[in-house]
Each structure stands twice: as C-alpha cells, then as structure tokens.
C-alpha cells in the first residue's frame, strides 16, 4: 500500500507542472499503475485483518467509500479548479495523498518488516 501511495504521489505532483496535453496524458496513464497497485492491496489487507463475520460488511463499506470518493473528488476538484486553478486542484490532491501516506505509515508501521500481516 505504501509503495502504491508513494508512486501515486510521485506521479500526481508533476501533473501540476505539465506544459502540454501529451505530458498530462502520459502521467495519467502512469497513474493507472498506482491505482492498479492500491486496490488489490487494500482488498487483500481488508480480508486479512477483518474477522470472518465482518468481511462482507467491511467490503460493503470500502465499496461505498470508494464510490463516494469517485463522486466527491471530481466535484471538489472541479470547484477548486474553477475558483483557483487546475494546478491548485492537482497540488491539493497531492497533499491529500501525502496525508494518506503518513496515516498509512503510522497505522501499519508494525507490519513493515514482516513478510505477512498474519505473522
């Protein structure tokens, strides 16, 4: 998860400084790899740390939060882009990813040196 988040941050930040649609397209393409790394990692982590009787509920919450983010993210981002600039919206997203990296590191640091979360 941390590697996926760091990769996502490293891709998001340069998006604020692109000079052409081609540059933005390439970075957006690369961003797909970050999302591709995050979703399976999160799902795997949820299935391992959740008690068996709560797995269906936690996956429902995860899906609900994901869908909520897919709606509110573009709404907030477009409002910021409209009132300030696209650059501000992208930098804001980068800052949000940094907060997520810090939060994930704090909450999962005890697992960083283990081969499996189940150890």
Swiss-Prot record:
It is a multi-pass membrane protein. InterPro entries: MFS, MFS_dom, MFS_MdtG_subfamily, MFS_trans_sf. Keywords: Cell membrane, Membrane, Transmembrane, Transmembrane helix, Transport. The keyword Transmembrane applies. Gene3D superfamilies: MFS general substrate transporter like domains. GO terms for molecular function: transmembrane transporter activity. GO terms for cellular component: plasma membrane. It holds the Pfam family MFS_1. It is found in: Cell membrane. It comes from the Bacteria. Belongs to the major facilitator superfamily. This is Multi-drug resistance efflux pump PmrA homolog. It comes from Lactococcus lactis subsp. cremoris (Streptococcus cremoris).
């Amino acid at each position: 998860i941390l590697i996926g988040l760091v990769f996502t941050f490293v891709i998001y930040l340069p998006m604020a400084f692109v000079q052409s649609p081609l540059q933005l397209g390439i970075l957006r393409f690369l961003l797909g790899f970050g999302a591709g790394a995050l979703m399976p990692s999160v799902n795997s982590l949820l299935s391992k740390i959740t008690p068996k009787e709560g797995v269906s509920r936690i996956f429902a919450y995860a899906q609900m939060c994901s869908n909520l983010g897919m709606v509110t993210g573009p709404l907030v981002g477009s409002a910021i882009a409209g009132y300030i600039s696209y650059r501000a919206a992208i930098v804001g997203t980068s800052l949000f990813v940094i907060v997520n990296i810090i939060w994930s590191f704090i909450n999962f640091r005890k697992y960083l040196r283990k081969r499996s979360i189940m150890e």
